[in-house]
């Protein structure tokens, strides 16, 4: 009989996502995840099999979380693109998006999420304006940690609506 897992997968996945966000995907190794979680590297190998599967599982788990929070935000947000973007408080990080692009299934999840958000942003309006608004929102997220906040999303919404 196997021992009970003392550290849930969600905690392991959070550590993997932190490593990806802070140091890049190459920083994820059984040893670095072991240090971050307190599990032994052999325990991680036993749990996930191989490194690519462990990373894939973490990214898949994160896409499931993002899709659920997006559905909640869409259901609860007031009408209009600005309200929706404010409600989407935890979009995928640029590092997570980059890591997802290397895997066909994750790339499909990212594409479907983007399309879903763009449709919600467009409402009955212009689909091209919604695509530009989505791109501006993601671009802002990309540069948020690097530069000061000179760009205001609400100004883009006014111009594109």
Regions from the language model: what does each represent?
Residues 82-114:
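Amphipathic alpha-helical segments used for helix-helix packing
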């Amino acid at each position: 009989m196997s021992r009970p897992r003392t550290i849930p997968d969600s905690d392991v996945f959070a550590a993997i996502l932190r490593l990806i966000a802070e140091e890049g995907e190459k920083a994820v190794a059984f040893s670095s995840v072991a240090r971050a979680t307190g599990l032994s590297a052999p325990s991680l190998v036993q749990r996930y099999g191989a490194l690519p599967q462990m990373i894939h599982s973490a990214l898949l788990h994160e896409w499931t979380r993002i899709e659920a929070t997006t559905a909640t935000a869409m259901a609860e947000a007031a009408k209009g693109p600005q309200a929706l973007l404010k409600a989407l408080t935890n979009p995928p990080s640029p590092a997570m998006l980059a890591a997802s692009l290397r895997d066909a299934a994750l790339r499909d999840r990212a594409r479907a999420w983007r399309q879903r958000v763009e449709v919600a942003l467009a409402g009955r309006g212009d689909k091209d304006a919604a695509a530009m608004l989505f791109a501006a929102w993601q671009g802002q997220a990309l540069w948020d940690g690097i530069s000061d906040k000179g760009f205001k999303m609400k100004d883009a919404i006014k111009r594109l609506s």
